């Protein structure tokens, strides 16, 4: 009877993961792992994507869908080659809510911007500029991307470029440079003008508030006495402080009026230290306990502990047992590493599909969630322009 009873799962998240039903509230259990989007998210796609955390088949379907979108980019023959890239980026953002290395989003960003960076058609396209800005948000230092856009005159007519660039520079405490970037966008009449002017006014308010705070801090500190280790107050400060203490201390009134703070005081003399010095009486010099202090000796006598001659340390040998090493003992300690054949076959199939996609596509890197994409993502995060030609930085 006890064997037939089922153990009730108290954790609601574990209970949901063990179940196969779709409640429509999957995002409630994984919302701390969802990267927010400015345009919002589709709840249906979000729930389906989060369900793939517990369903291996759903995850394989997502990877297969991503592969199809990448192939569609290479096979596109329409008038707007940027549109399949935008569609793929939006789908990856929805289907892989946490983002991360396995999503391949950073690699898609890099290949999209590298595909059209020299195209005159898309230099002023707002969609293309937003891909650049989203790519910059995922990198360790976005300043190199903003400088690249400035050199190649990409997005210079849009206010969102100057706002993002200036806010990034302001975050690095380069207020003067950020102000110059705002003024550059205003002088170029970047659109929309109202958005740029509003962002610049907010920037000036933050700058003035920061300068006022810096000016008020020294005034507040001047009212307090500055005390630090190893420093002494001046004589005037000491006298003023004594007078202030004397006016509030009732015992100070009992002092004589002619008594001054500069009255000399007697120095305490230790009788024992006087006997050890040369001022001791003649009767004490004859005592035997003081003879060692009077006879200091020469330099060789005082430094005899530092002048010992070197000696051999190998005069005594510790007996040791010989160590016998046999080949049989070494071979017996080895063990076989377990290999999952089913997992290896799946990886071989994905690698075969990957190779087929590589042969059919020369512009898009196939993404299968392997180690290569994780490594490439980390390299791009540190150096986002690593695949760009050197002449792309020249004006």
UniProtKB/Swiss-Prot annotation:
Polar residues bias spans: 245-263
Chain ranges for the short sequence motif Nuclear localization signal as given in the UniProt record: 118-125
Region of interest (Necessary for kinetochore localization), residue spans: 59-206
Induction: Cell cycle regulated expression with a distinct expression peak at the G2/M boundary.
UniProt-annotated location(s): Chromosome; Cytoplasm; Nucleus; Chromosome, Centromere, Kinetochore
Keywords from the named record: Cell cycle, Centromere, Chromosome, Cytoplasm, Cytoskeleton, Kinetochore, Nucleus
UniProt-listed InterPro entries: Bub1/Mad3, Mad3/Bub1_I
Domain BUB1 N-terminal: 69-224
GO cellular component: chromocenter; cytoplasm; kinetochore; kinetochore microtubule; microtubule organizing center; nucleus; spindle microtubule
UniProt note on tissues of expression: Expressed in actively dividing tissues, early in organ development, in young leaves, lateral root primordia and root meristems.
Gene3D superfamilies, per the entry: 1.25.40.430
Gene Ontology annotations of biological process type: mitotic spindle assembly checkpoint signaling
Motif (KEN box 1): 219-221
Organism superkingdom: Eukaryota
Annotated Pfam families: Mad3_BUB1_I
Predominant location category: nucleus
Domain notes: The KEN box is required for its ubiquitination and degradation. BUB1 N-terminal domain directs kinetochore localization and binding to BUB3.
Xref: PANTHER family: MITOTIC CHECKPOINT SERINE/THREONINE-PROTEIN KINASE BUB1, MITOTIC SPINDLE CHECKPOINT PROTEIN BUBR1
Role according to the record: Essential component of the mitotic checkpoint. Required for normal mitosis progression. The mitotic checkpoint delays anaphase until all chromosomes are properly attached to the mitotic spindle. One of its checkpoint functions may be to inhibit the activity of the anaphase-promoting complex/cyclosome (APC/C) by blocking the binding of CDC20 to APC/C.
SUBUNIT field: Interacts with anaphase-promoting complex/cyclosome (APC/C). Part of the mitotic checkpoint complex (MCC); interacts with CDC20-1 and CDC20-2. Interacts with MAD2 at chromocenters and with BUB3.1.
Name by which UniProt lists this protein: Mitotic spindle checkpoint protein BUBR1
